[in-house]
Curated annotation (Swiss-Prot):
It catalyses: 5-oxo-L-proline + ATP + 2 H2O = L-glutamate + ADP + phosphate + H(+). GO terms for molecular function: 5-oxoprolinase (ATP-hydrolyzing) activity; ATP binding. The gene is pxpA. The keyword NAD does not apply. This is 5-oxoprolinase subunit A. InterPro entries: Glyco_hydro/deAcase_b/a-brl (IPR011330), LamB/YcsF/PxpA-like (IPR005501).
Amino acid sequence: MLTIDINCDCGESYGAFQVGDDDGILPFVSSANVACGGHAGDPMVMRRTVRRCRDLGVAVGAHPSYPDLYGFGRRVLPLTPDEIEAWVLTQIGSLAAIARSEKVELRHVKPHGALYNVAARDLTVAMAIARAVAAFSRELALVGLAGSLLITAGHEVGVPVLAEAFADRTYEADGTLRNRHHPDALIIDPAACLAQTLHIIRDGAVRAVDGTLVPLQAATICIHGDTPGAALRAATIRQGLAAAGITVQAPQR
């Protein structure tokens, strides 16, 4: 029987600013990447999100970023490896404290935005993130783009790794994500998201924007929750996977 983890980024509101449709998307995923103060996610948002995940049986992970509230973590900041390690460790610890108070154990760490993208191609940054994860707990899984240097770094420091693919993002021929500046970077149509998800799970490949068939082995697939129609896409994917006999569940330790 085929199984797959479906994850989403969530808890990305901050104070009076509301981002994403967490209530709409969380019932359809098995893992959640919770913002923990770097780009979003104040303490009350973190607590509310952890509680919602606990009630739904969704595995909770940290979603650290560059310290960039103003830019929502989508800007590259000129930090040293030591600074990156410290910022990532601090954000993991913040969410872990709240999770512990709610009797929830963190399961994974997935960098956000620019930090995720830089770590995919820069081993120095990737190693800084991996060291932070290992310093906190070697039982935490490190989530990174399938085939990227972040996966390499996780193996190097000896933490579990989860190679990630995307249901709602398009790919370049080299296996990287198409830059969000391009109008076709996001896949909006729910049926197209489901088709890409099934292609990844069944065939271990994804079709790039230029038509190239890119080999891709993924343990977890992300659905973004901060775009219009996210809940419908998540529901379509979950229902389509069930119809195909594919079980959705968080990775087992």
